[in-house]
Amino acid sequence: MAPIYTAKTFEPAAINFGPVEKNKMGGKFIPIVDKNGTKTKVTLQFPAMNLPFGISAYRDRPENDPMSYSVDLSFRGYETNENTLLLFNKLTEFDNHLIDAAYANSVAWFGKQKSRELLEDTYRKLTKVDPSGKYAPMTKTKISLRNGKPNVQVFDTDKSNISVEDVPRGATVKVIAEIGSVWFIGSGTSWGVTFQALQLLVTEKPNKMTDFAFVSEDGEEDAPVSTEPMFDSE
């Protein structure tokens, strides 16, 4: 079993990249390799983070079937949370490390020498920052499919197995996800890496009012229930 890194033990600068390869569809990819050049995957455990939209289900194209799924995680409050701040910094460091590697290997990866600025513009970063600063940064992991269904283990707060549909919007979750290669669209008009979620643990659910919750306001008594009709019958 590959080691599972946390934000504290994850070292982006130690990640190496192999030579260009072709997938079954003819597209190219760059495998992640260890220090001996053997293909490997990097498995990372994300700290507890807010899941504002729940598990997102969508179609890449209207005619595509089945659905695709992703886990969109918010860095809300990361400025004062050591673990989420460290993850944000490590993912940013990994983005820069990958862009540096792409620039150094531009001819092999893209067929020609590209400027670092162009590589930055076409690279899909692991963190998405709101330009206005109104919303917290986000990061995303995708969920692979097996036989058309989400291929991920999901655990409730009591560690029992649940389905992706049971994860509520606004929950706090931990995710274990992995990356294994660098992907490219076309000749490199878009490129990057994608975390694939392996396991998801719900650590906290949003509060819901399940019991009677109305309270009397100051100086107000509980109003009597009227049995009279609201309007007189004509």
Protein language model annotation of sequence segments:
Residues Y5, F10-P12, K39-K41, G180, ...:
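N-terminal functional modules and adjacent low-complexity/disordered segments of proteins
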Residues Y58, S106, I185, N207-M209:
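Generic alpha-helix signal with a bias toward terminal, lower-confidence helices
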Residues K114, T157, D211-A213:
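Generic preference for flexible, low-structure residues
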Residues K205-E234:
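Long, low-complexity intrinsically disordered regions
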